[in-house]
Amino acid sequence: INTAIASNPKGLGLAACDTSSVLDALNECVSKDIPVVTFDTGIADAPEGSIACEVCTDNAQAGSVAAENMYNAIKDVVANAEGQVIIGEVNQDATAQNIQQRGGGFIDKMIELLQADGKTVAVAGNEFYVNAAKNADAKEADADVVIQVAVPAQTTVELCSNEAQAILSKENCIAIFGSNQTAAEGVL
């Protein structure tokens, strides 16, 4: 990004995986009057005036659609479970706005669907996603369904894979969601 800025472009397109890592570069763009367009990665702490516009998916809706489709595939397993079941979610991070919204959209819709079928739900794992979850109604030990959310220490397929394997190794795990390409490749 710094090389691109040094060439004094007429504009810059940016899809940052680690949004906090580009803040200094965005300040430099402001000082050089270089407009920045972000793609599908809202930068929550972007310096004022540094983002000309954002082109993005409705990530909360995308997560919600993923939950609806997954639930259609697993609802009979959930309904007939003799004990607690786990639905996993792997997010590459808890800092990029698009990942936060997509992961949160999945969790919130899954909670809604499970509760509509009479199940109690807990969200466990990564603190950001646990705190952001809406309407979870049970403690982990007491829930019919636990949505287990994992975020690796760094954004790599290998570390997402490690997180996915930790969830998948639980005998009562019935499904897992990878919220973007990196996380999905790790799940696979």
PLM features: residue spans?
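A residue-level marker of the well-folded mature domains of exported/periplasmic proteins
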Residues: I1-L188
